Every structure is written in structure tokens, then in C-alpha cells.
Curated annotation (Swiss-Prot):
The keyword Aminoacyl-tRNA synthetase applies. It is found in: Cytoplasm. GO terms for biological process: phenylalanyl-tRNA aminoacylation. Its main location: cytoplasm. The lineage of its organism: Bacteria, Pseudomonadati, Pseudomonadota, Betaproteobacteria, Burkholderiales. Tetramer of two alpha and two beta subunits. This is Phenylalanine--tRNA ligase beta subunit. Belongs to the phenylalanyl-tRNA synthetase beta subunit family. Type 1 subfamily. Its cofactor is Mg(2+).
């Protein structure tokens, strides 16, 4: 949005300098991108009157002019402009004057006393282009008759005016006009707002144009009037041309300029039809497939049912709310016109211009929303200017209202506004802010019920009103309050270690940390978690990142594949991250979302050689027991049980459930062969995933006395059915340690396993196996006697025999 400061100050004139006004607008959300002078610097250029014009004696295209420039003496100036004539007033550059450089960055053009074809010239008569006021170089810049002779041209044309360029956010459609900016300025500064003086024009004709609105979802209100006898060749007043140019709009013709002027002034695009080119009445409707329209810009567009049009009895005449058609365009020969101003529903205009690869000021405004209550007033304003400039006789305004927005009140709680803004704003001050913004409201204690005005399409929810309060209150008045945290010593729980310590421990065991998205491919969830109903994202950033993960296995395999594709041979990675599981038992809290558990887990993956290639170690592929050893070291001193179980992502015979104190805390094992084949992995990676809490918790270290007496070691071999797991025997022996007979048992370790191929002299059947355990016993108070040791060993054997049918091997 671009406009001159002088135009703005005709509506509101706060006691602020240009820079202060710019800062105030920016801090209220109307970002001023640039301030620039209306014209480049000039010196010694004044208003002069041409007194006499005679032909140059030695040049056909030059004239010798006598000029009164208010200096007390008549100046002789040689001029080649085709429109020079006695009596006109023009800008005169005196000797010593400086004009803007011909090219940007060049030196100013200095005027000197010179001779042109032997005739002395005491200055220069200037065109608008030479002053860098416009691109018009067809002749001299003719000034209004009432401009004082001798006045500095900068004062005469207000060239020290400042042009504001404001970057508006899409929701601020109410500021796409000078009056809209003025309305905001008045609210921000408290300066009085002078509304435009719009008076109804007396109708001298009774004629109206038949109008039918067939699409109320396209057009909610349509106002128009007939004006006859206009002079389309009338010259646009200099003040209007000046304002349009400083708003970035070139002058076209009086009728077009007036329509554009009111759009920049009040924010409503309008359209002027050549009445004599309209066939019958007009119909506001949706387009039809197969129809086409040649637009004012020369393009011909193909229409369909998604585009609104204005048609007459013969053809389509305009692209509704976007651009008029060429067939009814006004020309310099136009004498009768039909003036239209309407309310177009934003949804019916949005995106239609872009569909045809162009944009217009009208579409830019209508797709954001334009005041639907002022169509008649704007028709009256345009009519007033047309009659003043072009003459003519106006008919009555035909105003058809079929479907206007029903704006529901929006409630705002003052307490919530204060909490969000971060400062206590008095309720009376909030009421004053709403009054300054022109927002009608009802107040009920802490609650303000605001009815959005017709020009504010951006007020729909409570947060919109809170934004308005913050803007007008002033962001600069909101104090900067950095978060304050009390500095105090906090006790460290010695029974817990941080996740950072776990990261360091894994890094020390040659694992590299990786960080992955918490959202993954739905196929990963099926493959690695057996989950067909994951937590889905409402707005995923990519189709392959559409669900929240419930396991880290998929992310780790994804990292493995990424590295293998880059010719890595040995990969050891881990991740400490959260998974997301639907759980109705979870209640909402500061760090919790109702219905969803978000536990933190530690996952790791090892692939390839167990060690880097070297001369001192044999190369082999990493296996289950390598990774199990890493996990046991990570858990120490906690001892976990590894229970044979099946997981959808793990090898059926090489995977286990991890249990700590009887509670399942994770999984470990080789990747399932099916997934190896699917993800094209040459070897099986070994992975584990475990709850972070199981690794964080640790027992408080307790000192124990080192015995001065030697330990006793006994080996026992028991025969059991091959289906009996070693872990089950360990569990039974661990239970026996609670008995008094086994109180001196320090350690039990398996050191041998034997399986008979058939019934042999070993005394074992083919379905049995022999397990050899080494039992270490020690007493801190004295040397153990054989009787005590024998009793402990017998207790262990009896327990295994009672539960699993174990017998000592003979």
C-alpha cells in the first residue's frame, strides 16, 4: 500500500513528525517498508508565466519565449516544447538551478547561461519528466492558473511530501485505502478523524438499468446508477493526478482516474461501463463452460462455473470483482455510463485472478473482504467527482441487497487478554481502545462482547480482539520481563543417573548418537511394531512422515540403510528419543497430552564386523551376545533377565524380552529375516530398545567387607530336559539363596553344556542335556567347613530337582 503523507493528513493530522508517524504505524502492525520524497532534490526552480512566444530565427523547432519568473526582470528562454504558448504557467529553472540527474546515481543537471543557435537562453522551461515527477515528456508541465508566479516549485507542487509504502499483512484488508490507514492512525494516536464529506447527488434522471443477481453466493449487494452526458475528454485535475501518481497509479482518463482515485481513497474498487454498449439489462451470475471474455488488458480468458461474471442480454461483459471486459470499456468518445459498486463474497473472488495468471487491485481487495455497508456512499462519491470534472446528469442509485454477512459477536475476557499480553490493562482502558477502533461492544464484568464492523473481516475469534488491544495499547509499553528463576542448590538423587550419562556410556562403547524425526512412515510402524493403528498426524510434512512412532527400531534401521547406501561397512548407532502410544489412562498435564503416553526410550543397533579390521583380532560379524554384553554393561549393577519371546521386528529364535525386577522394560535381538530381505540388508543387525527409566534407576552403592578367608568353589553337573532353559535354573538357585543353608553362596556361573546324540553310556537320553555350574562360596567370618559347603550344594540341587526334575550327572 503506497500513498502520500499529505493525502493521509487530510483525514487525520496527528502532532507527529513523519518519522514519528512511521514508527507509530510500524509498532501497531502496519509495517512501513520505506519513506521516500515525492520528488528528487531540486534548486532554483520556480513558477513562471510565458508572456510571449516567437519563432527562433535559426531553428524551425525552437521558440524564443519571454518569461516572467518573479525575478523582477523578464527572462528570455529558448524552448523546443510543442505545447509552449503565451499565458501558460510552467516550472522555470533559473540560471544556477539544479535538476535531478538524468540517470539514477548521476550528477545533478546544472542550468547555465547559454546560447542556442545564437540566441541567449536565461534558463529552462521544464517538463514533468525533467523534474522526475512522471514519465510524461510530451511537452511542458502546465501548472494551474492560480499558482503564484515566482513561487518555488517545491512549495507549489508540494514536492517535499513523503510517500509511505506500507507492507500489510493479509488480514488487514481494512487498511487498503488512505482512509483505512487514517482510521488506524486515529486509533493509534488519538488524533481526531475527519470522515469524507459524501453527500447524495440529486438525481436529474429517472432512468435505471435492469439488474438481476442470479448468484447471491457470489454478490451480496449491487449498487449502480446511470449517468448521461459526460465529457470523457475532460482533463483530470492536477491534484488528482498527483495523488494517483504518488499512490503508484498512472493517469489514464478522467473517468478511469476517478474510479481509481476513490478506490485508493476509500478502499472499494468500482467499475464504469459504457452504457451505450450494454445490451438490455445485466445479470450477476456464475460463468458457464464454453464462455469467453476479452478483458481490458487485452487477454481473452475461458470461463467456467467457478468464476463470477457480469453479463448483459448478449454476452459476458466483466469478470466479477476482478476486471472489466473490453467490449463495454469507456473511451474518450463515451457520453453515457453505468457506474457499479458491489459487495463480492471473498470466497467467490479468492484465487480467480491467479487462475488466469494475473492480479488486479480489485481482486486483491475483494478476496480479502471489502465493507459491504457503504456501496451506496461510494457510488455517491464517484458520482460527485464525475459531475464536477466531466459533467453530466445522474439517475437514482439502484441498490440491491440479497445476501450480506451476518457477523456474530466475538467475546473477549479481559483476564485472558492480560495473561496473554503479559501486562495488566485496566478494563476501562480496554473499553477506550475498542471505542477508538470503532468496535461496538457490550460489557459484562470481565467479558467484552464485540460486534465486528462491516469493514473488519479479520475479527472472528477472541485472539483477534486480544491482538487489537495489544496493538493499540502499544507493544513498546509492554515491559520486557525476562524469566526469573531462583538460584538454589538442589539435591541430586543418587539412585538415578541422567540420560546424558547413558549417552556417554554408549559412546564409550563405540556407538554414535543419531537423532531422528518422531514421525515416521506408516509402513515402518507395521513392520517394526506390528501396529496397524498408529497415532496419525493431521498435517504431515510429507506422506512418508505421517504417523508418530511407537518404537525406535524403524528409525535405527533407516539410519543403517542411509549409511549402507554410502558404502559404510560397520555401523553402531543409538538414539535416545520418545515414542508415542495411545493410552486412554493418561490424563492431560503440563507435559502430557490426554490419551497419549510419551515414554522415553534408548535404542541401539550394531551391524557389520564386531571390531574394525586389524591384525590382532579375527574379523567376524557382530552377534546377539556382543550387543547383549553392551546392554548388560549399560545396566550394571542392575542385573536383567532375558526371556525368550517373539517380537514382530526380531528373529523368532534370536530375540528376547528384557525384564528388570519382573517388569518388562524392552527387547533385544537380531532383525527378522523377512525385514532383512525387504530392506535389502546383507547381514542381520542386532538391536535393542529399552525404557530409559530402567537405565536411569540404579541402586545406591553400599560398601562390603572383603573377606580375609579363601573362597570355596564346587562344580556340579545336572541333567535336565532339553526344553528347560538355563535362565529358569538360575532363577530357582537365586530363590534358594534366601535360605539359611545357602547364605554363603556368592556366585553361580554356567561353564559347560553337553548334549548326547543318542542313548549312550553317559546315562543321558537324546532329549536331555547336561549343564555344569560353578558355585563360589565364601564367609567373611571364617573358613568354611565341608559340611556347610555340602549342605549349600545339596540345597541348590534339591531345588532344581523338585521344580525341573534335575538330577546329578553320574
Amino acid at each position: 500500500m503506497q500513498f502520500p503523507e499529505s493525502w493521509l493528513r487530510t483525514f487525520v493530522d496527528p502532532q507527529l513528525t513523519t518519522d514519528e508517524l512511521s514508527h507509530a504505524l510500524t509498532m501497531a502492525g502496519l509495517e512501513v517498508e520505506s519513506l521516500r520524497p515525492a520528488a528528487p532534490p531540486t534548486e532554483k526552480i520556480v513558477v513562471g508565466r510565458v508572456l510571449e512566444v516567437v519563432k527562433h530565427p535559426d531553428a524551425d523547432k525552437l521558440n524564443v519565449c519571454q518569461v516572467d519568473a518573479g525575478t523582477g526582470a523578464t527572462l528570455q528562454i529558448v524552448c523546443g516544447a510543442p505545447n509552449v504558448a503565451p499565458g501558460i504557467k510552467v516550472p522555470v529553472a533559473l540560471v544556477g538551478a539544479k535538476l535531478p540527474p538524468a540517470e539514477e546515481g548521476g550528477a545533478p543537471f546544472a542550468i547555465k547561461l547559454s546560447k542556442l543557435r545564437g540566441v541567449e537562453s536565461q534558463g529552462m522551461l521544464c517538463s514533468a519528466r525533467e523534474l522526475k515527477l512522471s514519465e510524461d515528456h510530451g511537452g511542458l508541465m502546465i501548472l494551474p492558473e492560480d499558482t503564484p508566479v515566482g513561487q518555488d516549485i517545491r512549495d507549489a507542487l508540494n514536492l517535499d511530501d513523503t510517500v509511505f509504502e506500507i507492507k500489510l499483512t493479509p488480514n488487514k484488508a481494512d487498511c487498503l485505502s488512505v482512509f483505512g490507514i487514517a482510521r488506524e492512525t486515529a486509533a493509534i494516536t488519538g488524533a481526531p478523524l475527519a470522515a469524507p464529506d459524501i453527500r447524495p447527488v440529486r438525481a436529474e434522471l429517472t432512468e435505471t438499468l435492469p439488474v438481476k443477481i442470479s448468484a447471491p453466493d457470489l454478490c451480496g449487494r449491487f449498487s449502480g446508477r446511470v449517468i448521461r452526458g459526460v465529457n470523457a475528454r475532460a482533463k483530470t485535475p492536477r491534484w488528482m493526478v498527483e495523488r494517483l501518481e504518488r499512490a503508484g497509479q498512472r493517469s489514464v482518463s478522467a473517468l478511469v482516474d476517478i474510479s481509481n482515485y476513490v478506490m485508493f481513497e476509500l478502499g472499494r474498487p468500482s467499475h464504469v461501463f459504457d452504457l451505450d454498449k450494454i445490451h438490455g439489462g445485466i445479470d450477476v451470475r456464475w460463468g458457464k463452460r464454453g464462455e469467453s471474455l476479452k478483458l481490458l488488458n487485452g487477454n481473452t480468458v475461458e470461463l467456467d462455473e467457478t468464476v463470477g461474471v457480469i453479463s448483459d442480454d448478449a454476452q459476458v461483459e466483466s469478470l466479477a470483482g476482478i476486471m472489466g471486459g473490453d467490449s463495454t470499456a469507456v473511451t474518450l468518445d463515451t457520453t453515457n455510463i453505468y457506474l457499479e459498486a458491489a459487495f463480492w463474497w471473498p470466497d467467490s473472488i479468492r484465487g480467480r485472478a491467479r487462475k488466469y495468471n494475473f492480479s488486479t487491485d480489485a481482486a486483491h481487495r475483494f478476496e480479502r473482504g471489502v465493507d459491504y455497508s457503504t456501496t451506496v456512499e461510494h457510488v455517491e462519491r464517484i458520482t460527485q467527482l464525475i459531475l464536477d470534472i466531466c459533467g453530466g446528469q445522474a439517475g437514482p442509485v439502484d441498490d440491491q441487497i440479497v445476501n450480506l454477512p451476518q457477523r456474530a459477536p466475538v467475546s473477549m475476557r479481559a483476564s485472558r487478554a492480560n495473561r496473554i499480553i503479559g501486562v495488566e490493562i485496566d478494563k476501562d482502558e480496554i473499553a477506550q481502545i475498542f471505542t477508538r477502533l470503532g468496535l461496538a461492544f457490550e460489557r459484562d464484568g470481565d467479558v467484552f462482547r464485540v460486534t465486528p464492523p462491516p469493514h473488519r473481516f479479520d475479527i472472528e475469534i477472541e485472539e483477534d480482539l486480544i491482538e487489537e488491544v495489544a496493538r493499540i495499547y502499544g507493544f513498546e509499553k509492554i515491559p520486557a520481563r525476562p524469566p526469573v528463576a531462583r538460584s538454589e542448590m538442589r539435591a541430586t538423587d543418587e539412585t538415578r543417573r541422567s540420560v546424558h550419562a547413558i549417552r556417554h556410556a554408549l559412546a564409550a562403547r563405540d556407538y554414535a548418537e543419531t537423532v531422528n524425526f518422531s514421525f515416521v512412515d506408516a509402513e515402518w510402524e507395521r513392520d517394526f511394531a506390528g501396529n496397524d493403528n498408529p497415532v496419525r498426524l493431521l498435517n504431515p510434512i510429507a506422506s512418508q512422515l505421517s504417523v508418530m512412532r511407537t518404537t525406535l527400531f524403524g528409525s535405527l534401521v533407516g539410519v543403517l540403510r542411509h549409511n549402507l547406501n554410502r558404502r559404510a561397512e560397520r555401523v553402531r548407532v543409538f538414539e535416545a528419543g520418545r515414542v508415542f502410544i495411545a493410552d486412554p489412562a493418561v490424563k492431560a498435564g503440563e507435559l502430557a497430552v490426554e490419551g497419549y503416553a510419551q515414554p522415553k526410550r534408548i535404542g541401539a543397533l550394531a551391524y557389520g564386523p564386531v571390531v574394525d579390521e586389524q591384525w590382532g583380532a579375527t574379523t567376524r560379524q557382530v552377534d546377539y551376545f556382543d550387543v547383549k554384553g553392551d546392554l548388560e554393561a549399560l545396566l550394571a549393577p542392575v542385573v536383567a533377565r532375558f526371556v525368550k519371546a517373539e517380537h514382530s521386528a526380531l528373529h523368532p529364535g534370536r530375540g528376547a524380552r528384557i525384564e528388570v525386577d519382573g517388569r518388562a522394560v524392552g527387547w533385544i535381538g537380531e532383525l527378522h529375516p523377512r525385514l532383512m530381505q525387504k530392506y535389502e540388508l546383507p547381514h542381520a543387525p542386532v538391536m535393542f530398545e529399552i525404557d530409559a527409566d530402567a537405565l536411569v534407576a540404579r541402586a545406591l552403592p553400599a560398601p562390603s567387607e572383603v573377606s580375609k578367608f579363601p573362597p570355596v568353589r564346587r562344580d556340579i553337573a545336572v541333567v535336565v530336559d532339553q526344553k528347560v532353559e538355563v535362565q529358569a535354573l538360575f532363577d530357582e538357585m537365586k530363590k534358594a539363596l534366601a535360605e539359611d543353608a545357602c547364605k554363603f553362596v556368592q556366585k553361580v556361573a554356567l561353564f559347560d553344556e553337553f548334549r548326547a546324540k543318542s542313548n549312550t553310556s553317559s546315562g543321558m537320553s537324546a532329549h536331555e542335556k547336561s549343564l555344569a555350574f560353578r558355585v563360589t562360596l565364601q564367609d567373611a567370618a571364617g573358613t568354611l567347613q565341608d559340611e556347610t559347603v555340602d549342605q549349600a550344594i545339596q540345597t541348590l540341587v534339591d531345588r532344581m530337582a523338585r521344580v525341573y526334575g534335575a538330577r546329578l550327572r553320574g
